[in-house]
Regions:
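Serine/threonine-rich low-complexity intrinsically disordered regions
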Residues: 1-2, 24, 108, 146
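Alpha-helix boundary/capping detector
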Residues: 3, 66-67, 142-143
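Bacterial Sec-dependent N-terminal signal peptides
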Residues: 1-22
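Short, structured protein-protein interaction patches enriched in aromatics and acidic/basic residues
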Residues: 134-137, 141-146
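Short helix/turn-capping signatures at newly exposed starts of structured segments
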Residues: 16-129, 137-139, 157-181
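Positively charged
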Residues: 69, 144-149
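Short, solvent-exposed loop/beta-turn-alpha elements that line the ligand-binding surface or hinge
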Residues: 152-155
Length: 181
């Protein structure tokens, strides 16, 4: 009986620790889409929050940013609300910094374009001046990939239509972002 309780306890602990860093549609770890700035202190009570509010040294910043650090001083996430200076604002964008955070299918900040393409449905690719933005709607994510990975003839300008086949599978993610509009 004790052995069964121990195994069950280990399973529950493992499941909870996995969910703490899981990325799903409408959820990033402990944070859900409906959470507001006001709730961040209680959600991350065991972590550290650095608040870069658009004042003082950051007064010319167009956004407030909330940097979430673990107790081990590892930068985990950067959260940006829709509007500045309003604690009732929901979080609009999340930059995934730590490789602890991953999708159910194992995609994290160290993944490649090929892994994303293999494990998630890509809904669109936007060509910008220096980067590609790869959209994965089923997890509210977009991935920024440097255009330096593309063949030379596709790197310049924004008018070229970039298809999945044009992006080398070993292209690394520059940024892993979650967008909640």
């Amino acid at each position: 009986m004790r052995k069964k309780c121990l195994i069950l306890s280990i399973f529950i602990f493992y499941s909870c620790s996995q969910n703490e860093y899981r990325i799903e549609k409408g959820k990033v770890g402990k944070l859900i889409k409906e959470n507001t700035v006001r709730q961040l202190d209680s959600i991350y009570s065991n972590d550290s929050i650095v608040k870069r509010i658009g004042e003082g040294d950051y007064m010319f910043s167009g956004d407030d940013k909330y940097l979430i650090y673990s107790r081990k001083k590892e930068h985990l996430l950067t959260l940006t609300p829709r509007n500045q200076h309003d604690p009732s604002e929901p979080i609009e964008t999340i930059q995934i910094i730590s490789d602890l955070f991953q999708t159910k299918k194992g995609i994290n900040v160290n993944s490649t374009f090929g892994e994303i393409d293999k494990k998630h449905q890509i809904n669109g690719i936007q060509n910008t001046i220096n980067n590609l933005i790869v959209y994965v709607d089923n997890i509210d994510a977009y991935f920024i990939i440097d255009k330096k990975n593309l063949p030379l003839e596709l790197r310049l300008g924004t008018e070229n239509k970039i298809e999945k086949i044009n992006i080398p599978t070993d292209s690394k993610i520059k940024r892993f972002m979650i967008g909640w509009n």
